Amino acid sequence: MAVHACGAAAAVVALLSAAIALQWSPLYAVLQRALSLHTAHATKDMENLFQLVRNIVPALTSKKHKGQDGRIGIVGGCQEYTGAPYFAGISALKVGADLTHVFCAREAAPVIKSYSPELIVHPVLDSSNAVEEVEKWLPRLHALVVGPGLGRDDLLLNNVRGILESTKARDIPVVIDADGLWLVAQQPALIHSYHKAILTPNHVEFSRLWEAVLSSPMDSNDLKGSTLKLSQALGNITVVQKGEQDLISNGQQVLVCNQEGSSRRCGGQGDLLSGSLGVMVHWALRAGPEKTNGSSPLLVAAWGACTLTRECNRQAFQKYGRSTTTTDMITEVGTAFSRLFTT
């Protein structure tokens, strides 16, 4: 299943119709019908994707206990970067996770704690036994988000390497972003063929990953094809290339998320995406293929998180314009989620 924008087809029809409408009306009618069918198919694909995301969203019921709808771990946060793990963690809670744990460096912990009393903060990431400390919590977690605010300190990266190995051994889904992607670019074997991994690179991060695993030059005119090829080169893991359109591939198909956002790009909105995706991938895997109509649960989760992030951006921009920040976007999570995915 793929969703394609129909803007290109519309432009072609607009250019040709002026030349042929008067003299070749049958051809004009054919072109108009082609555009109509293209638009109808794109709209149907979009509606199907929205429904698949709605299918994985758990019902709110008094029969559940705390933790069932998501216990998410965020791995990141160092002296320089404390906002990113907070953004990812609080976004996970706003989307609907019950509990969020942040595993960060000791110096980052008091700052992150001060941002929100709702996050459970573990100041262990720069300790000599960081892997063992995080391993103790892994059986309680449904998904990990690795990379927000991580930085590139050798000790932290080495500890995260061990955490990723332990995560794979326990078959826990993992979303990798930011400097977690830098680590993967240095050692692609860390996540190669791990089908519960999702990478969320921006353009620069995507190019770095491409250079690390593919010898051929990247075709900047075929971003969908490039996303597909990078996923295949990494063993068909899910890749989300963020950009003007978000392109999502598991090496077999490509989904396109072109939900309206805004022209404002503020630092931290990728953390909103990764935190949201951590929750949604848990929901999608728990729901299973029967709820995703045979589609990859990870693809459905990724498309849902991308769509939500773009809608938060749109809503915040309508209110704040150029001054929009990620904090403003996070405030919109509840209304955006209801607008998109609540029936």
Swiss-Prot record:
It comes from Mus musculus. This is ATP-dependent (S)-NAD(P)H-hydrate dehydratase. GO terms for cellular component: cytosol; endoplasmic reticulum; mitochondrion. Catalyzes the dehydration of the S-form of NAD(P)HX at the expense of ATP, which is converted to ADP. Together with NAD(P)HX epimerase, which catalyzes the epimerization of the S- and R-forms, the enzyme allows the repair of both epimers of NAD(P)HX, a damaged form of NAD(P)H that is a result of enzymatic or heat-dependent hydration. It catalyses: (6S)-NADHX + ATP = ADP + phosphate + NADH + H(+); (6S)-NADPHX + ATP = ADP + phosphate + NADPH + H(+). PROSITE patterns: YJEF_C_3. Residues 49-340 form the YjeF C-terminal domain. ATP binds at residues 242-246, 261-270. Keywords: Acetylation, ATP-binding, Lyase, Mitochondrion, NAD, NADP, Nucleotide-binding, Phosphoprotein, Transit peptide. The gene is Naxd. The modification Phosphoserine is found at residue 216. The modification N6-acetyllysine is found at residue 63.
